[in-house]
Structures are given as structure tokens and as C-alpha cells.
Amino acid sequence: RYLEERDIGFDVGVTKVPLVSQSCLFDLGVGSKEVRPTAEMAYQACENAGRSAPAEGNVGAGTGCSIGKYRGMGRAMKSGFGTYALQTGPLKVGALVAVNALGDVYGPDGRPAAGLLNEKRTSLSCTLEEMFADIAPAENLFAGNTTLGVVVTNGMFDKTPLTKLAGMAHNGYARAIRPVHTTADGDSIYALSLGDVPGDINVVGAMAALTMERAILRAVQSAGSAYGLIGWEDLPR
């Protein structure tokens, strides 16, 4: 409805059909399972998007996000929604991400920032170390994990280079989330071009990976404790 009101969509002659890609993440393990998103929520989100800088943390798709779920929700931490952007000359690249991962999140210094807690929930454990110790598949592995990201640029690209851009942005996932792209994760990234600035796809791809890496860290650092899950600020240090 929001797009139709603004005459945005694929022109089929008699009308314009809005093309809307979508993904979902599993957050029914927190809050009320009776709550459902509505068309009005989506419309309001579209209106809010152009008014100010996007909110981060426990908002929108980030409301029910969690990370570090290798041992289930009992040792998981709260995560959320994060953004980050870079500019070089006239070329701009931004990333938005809802981090709902099985693994832990690491900072650019290579140190863990948030994720799987130890059995007493007093400090961080390490998902990779616990996985390597198991060797055999973990029992009852929590499979409701999905990190959803978007990279946006004002660079002028069509579908083919944008597909490459989305793939390069996954390097940001690999730097910030460990492990990532597991069989228990439904990780995906969308890439959008909103401008006409000439740009090298390799440059834009490298920028996209960096913005995504930083957006993931902001997603966990902005998420406060909620639904019985510890947030980054409340993590004992």
C-alpha cells in the first residue's frame, strides 16, 4: 500500500506492481507467541524509515533476537538490530542487520563481545570451543537461528553486480559471527542500489563487508537485557 500510494512498482502496462522481497527470523522463544506483525506495522515502518536515523537494539526485527544458542536459550544472550555506514568521496554504503545467530559475536579486535554464556551465566564461554569438544553433533541443537542483513549503496549497479555485492557482504558475517552459515542458521543478505554514482564493485563490496561487520557489533551492543536474556551492557566483566 505504501508503495502503491507513491506509484512505485514494476510497470505492467495497466498498473505498477510493487515487488517486495522478504525474509523472517524465529523469535517465538521470547515474549508472547500470540503477537503477530500487521500490515499497519509495516506501513508505519516505511513512514518511519525516512524521518530520522534508524533506531537500534531491541526494535523492529531486533526485538526478539538472541545469540549464543549452541546450548539452547538458557545460556543465550540478547541481541538486536544494528546499522553502520561508510562514505568515500560521493560513494556511500550502508548496512542494516538483525542478528539472531547460533554463534557468538566478535569485535574488530578479534575478541568476543557477546554470545554463549558459561553454565553459571556469569561470563562468556566460547561456542567454537564447546563445538570442537563435542565432535559429534550436539543433541537438540537449536535451529531457529537467522541473521538477516541488507546492504544499500548509491552506487549504480544492476542485478548481476548486486548479487556479487550481497555475496561479498557475507564476509562481514564471517568476521563478526563465529560460527556462521551453519546448518542451524538461515543467514541471508539483500543488496540494493539507490543511486547513480559510478563505482567499482570490488570497492563497494569491501565497504559492504566492513559496514556489515560493524553493524553486527552495534546490534549486540545496542540491545538491552530483555525476556530473561542478558544484554551486552549487563554482561559481567
Where are these regions (language model features)?
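A structural signal for small-residue-enriched, beta-sheet-centric alpha/beta enzyme cores
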Residues: 1-237
